[in-house]
């Protein structure tokens, strides 16, 4: 047993976000950032994973290594992709168009609910700067354009952290009981 889950974490509950997606994106950000800082002396700004990559719920109760393999059965590794602020806007437009609760951390998208147009984007509570490079933690699958995330594939700035996303979940659950 790695940890205890006080409530079921499920990707099907939520329109723009899900509790399991938020958890996985936050874990990826939290555990990937020190590795990126040590290797490249840079900081992850945003983490974006994909809704379809979450393959099971984390049920209320004991969380085991098997749970981690059921939730994340793929051998996805953490890739950090450098995107301009303009490309971040494209990323936000993709999320809105998809209408799926893709796991996201470090970014807020404010939209007009009637038109679904973007009013404002914040990265770590700061307004988006279209000329800046932002470092986005994601999976190797998405970095290569999976799920039609072509904004990642087109980037020339990529860092392979050689760190399995599932292993991050296991490590985090070993450290924190709930």
Regions found by a protein language model. Give the residues of each.
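Acidic/histidine-rich, surface-exposed loop or edge segments in extracytoplasmic proteins
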Residues: 2-15, 70, 149-153
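Short intrinsically disordered, low-complexity coil segments enriched in acidic
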Residues: 1-4, 175-177
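Feature captures C-terminal
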Residues: 22-178
């Amino acid at each position: 047993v790695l940890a205890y889950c006080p409530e079921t974490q499920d990707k099907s509950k939520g329109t723009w976000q899900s509790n399991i997606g938020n958890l996985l994106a936050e874990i990826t950000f939290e555990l990937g950032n020190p590795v990126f800082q040590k290797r490249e002396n840079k900081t992850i700004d945003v983490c974006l994973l994909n809704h379809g990559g979450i393959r099971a719920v984390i049920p209320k109760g004991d969380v085991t290594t098997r749970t981690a393999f059921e939730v994340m059965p793929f051998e996805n590794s953490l890739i950090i992709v450098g995107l301009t602020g303009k490309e971040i806007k494209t990323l936000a437009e993709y999320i809105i168009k998809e209408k799926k609760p893709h796991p996201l951390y470090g970014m807020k998208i404010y939209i007009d609910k009637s038109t679904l147009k973007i009013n404002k984007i914040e990265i770590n509570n700061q307004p988006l700067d279209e000329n800046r490079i932002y470092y986005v933690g994601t999976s190797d699958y998405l970095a290569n354009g999976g799920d039609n995330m072509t904004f990642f594939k087109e980037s020339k700035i990529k860092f392979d952290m050689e760190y399995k996303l599932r292993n991050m979940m296991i490590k985090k659950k070993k450290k924190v009981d709930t």
